[in-house]
Amino acid sequence: MNHRKEKIESAMNMLENNMEFLCVTGVEDKLQDDVMDTIESLKNAGIKIWMLTGDKVETATCIAISTGLKSKTQRLFFLRDINNVQQVTEELEKLKFQSDYILIIDGGCLDFCLKQSESLFFEVTMNANSVVCCRCSPTQKAKIIALIKKHTDKRCLAIGDGGNDVAMIQEAHVGVGIVGKEGKQASLAADFSINQFKDLKLLLLWFGRISYKNTAKISHFVIHRGLIISFLQFIFSIMFYCVPIALYNGNLIVG
């Protein structure tokens, strides 16, 4: 249908006249505890955060503000309702010279950018403080993770709590699933499972760092141990005229 949006607005203007509200209801999807504090800690640790959601642009923008993803000094740039190459290129070129901003893009425009201006799009998004992708399908979420891995050498962590996040979680280097009201699909598909979003702070900034340091220590120990054993075996062989006799038995070397 041509001019669908204009025709819908015309029909609404024709029908929605002389009407009285009988009641007004609202639905609020409350944030979990300490979400803002967790995001602030992750940002202070130098972690760039992307929000990939199926919500509409207005809802996603409100969530980005309420969670602290956008600071008071940062500007919002919107990419939406674009369907031609020239306009996409012009908007992305403008953003190349901007700084300290949040990019908000809808699913239709995102799909168009990835098809027509993939390299330019990721050049722009890497300069943004954060990126909010709205109206994303599960396939788009996984594709974004794959393209970030392709265009950068960064490690990607994906976190979600619903079945729509499974593909994204499996595509990332590290997947974290939240056990929530939407079921356990995400947590079962993930590398790590947590109960609330705030647990991500402890997982990354405490257990993640401790595990990294312990792994480094074990690696150093194995390397040094191997060098010492090899050197002692070399000296032992020279002392006994290169006779093929082992200085240590197999159990000691393995242990």
Language-model-detected regions and their locations in the chain:
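Short beta->alpha linker loops
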Residues: D55-K56, C136
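Conserved Rossmann-like nucleotide-cofactor binding loop
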Residues: V57-E58, N164
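Membrane-embedded transport module
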Residues: S41, S66-L157, G162, V166-G255
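Conserved residues at the C-terminal ends of beta-strands
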Residues: T25, T53-G54, I178, Q196
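Signature of the cytosolic headpiece of P-type E1-E2 ATPases
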Residues: M1-L52, E58, V85-I102, F112-Q116
